[in-house]
Amino acid sequence: MHLPTSSNARAIVLENVSKRFRVVSIPKHASFKETIVRLDFLKRKKRDQRFVEAVRNVSFSVARAETLGIIGKNGSGKSTLMRLLAGIYKPDTGSVAIAGEIAPLLSLGISFHPDMTGRENIRINGLVLGLSPAEIKQRYLEIVAFSELEEFIDFPERTYSSGMYMFLAFAVAINVDPDVLLLDEVLSVGDEAFSEKCRIRMRAFKDAARTIVLVSHDAGMIRQWCDTAVWLDHGAMRMFGPANDVVDAYHRELHVASNEAALIS
């Protein structure tokens, strides 16, 4: 669903969004044929199917030009929520509405084909993110220069390190010039010099009244960059509000849990 892109409009609106996944138990050493037979059996035997709710009844909105942080423990639903925002997943219930074009930079290399070269992946990702062939050609040199991968651009992606993946993925995403930029732990990989270059480009993006959604375990980064934040806990939204308030509440709970664990041990 798309929202109007007028200057006073909200950039993102989620209403009662839920997403669940079926739990499938496959023996560790099952053959491919055994796996297919097992999946077909489970599909037919619907009454015995088990599901896990990765995101449960989440509602919030983000204003245009705001930066939203998403925090929570591992397994709390952060990555699933980002994939819902990106349109990779469709919600089982509720609605996700975005104003304008989105550039998702989620799990590193998620949209890259490992057997394609960096050059080929720039073209494919540019098309996926909405650029025309002419626009990709026009921005190609800038993307390569920003990624600092000139020497490796004709190597297959499977030869890239995780840092190199991030360099190229960020360079493509930021040069698409989107209205909404989704970033999932992207600055946790790579050297500090490149991370600083990414932060400078993010600042320019933010100053241009664009919207950013940022997942990070770095509380300092959430405080520095984000206007508001969402705290997810087992798929549910525990808190939504000013970033500093949400981070403080999250850290208080972590501190209490740590003290309780120490007493038990």
Set out the residue ranges of the language-model regions.
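Pre-NBD coupling/linker segments of ABC/ABC-like ATPases
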Residues: M1-A54, A243-I264
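Conserved ABC ATPase "signature" region
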Residues: K33-K43, R123, E135-F152, A171
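The feature captures the beta-strand-to-loop junction immediately N-terminal to the Walker
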Residues: I71-K73
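H-loop/switch region of ABC-family ATPase nucleotide-binding domains
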Residues: S216-H217
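Conserved catalytic segment of ABC-fold P-loop ATPases
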Residues: Q224-W231
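Conserved ABC ATPase "signature" C-loop
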Residues: H234-G235, Y250
